[in-house]
From Swiss-Prot:
Native source organism of the sequence: Chlamydia abortus (strain DSM 27085 / S26/3) (Chlamydophila abortus)
Keywords recorded for this protein, A-Z: Ribonucleoprotein, Ribosomal protein, RNA-binding, rRNA-binding
GO molecular function: large ribosomal subunit rRNA binding; structural constituent of ribosome
Protein name, per record: Large ribosomal subunit protein uL14
Gene name, Swiss-Prot/TrEMBL: rplN
Summary of subunit composition and partner proteins: Part of the 50S ribosomal subunit. Forms a cluster with proteins L3 and L19. In the 70S ribosome, L14 and L19 interact and together make contacts with the 16S rRNA in bridges B5 and B8.
Keyword Cytoplasm: no
């Protein structure tokens, strides 16, 4: 579960390495976000010559969490890191590559472009 002040790794090639969440979208008093939810975050660490700069406010979709993801068939899934992918206003990824596996719930939430760029969908 991701909440305000949570720090996440960035799983794409926009040049951002780490972001800090400061708002969970989807309700006036919503506190937590999980896989497939959109958050507003601030870029904390960047690589040189990146498309985003330190301090930029961006939207991102969460693709991996350390918290268990419970599925309807009774199985559960969790990852080693909390990670996100930076998106634009239309919901398309800003980067052209995605690193590491992502959860199947991303495709179910309508982020088909992100799931097609990912090397593995679990």
């Amino acid at each position: 579960m991701i909440q305000q002040e949570s720090q996440l790794k960035v799983a794409d090639n926009t040049g951002a390495k780490r972001v800090k969440c400061f708002k969970v979208l989807g309700g006036s008093r919503r506190r937590y976000a999980t896989v497939g939810d959109v958050i507003v975050c601030s870029v904390r660490d960047v690589e040189p010559d990146s498309s985003v700069k330190k301090g930029d406010v961006v939207k991102a979709v969460i693709v991996r969490t350390r918290r268990n993801i419970l599925r309807k068939d009774g199985s559960s899934l969790k990852f080693d890191t909390n990670s996100c992918v930076i998106i634009d206003e239309k919901g398309n990824p800003k980067g052209t590559r995605i690193f590491g596996p992502i959860a199947r719930e991303i495709r179910d939430r309508g982020f088909v472009k992100i799931s097609s760029l990912a090397p593995e969908v679990i």
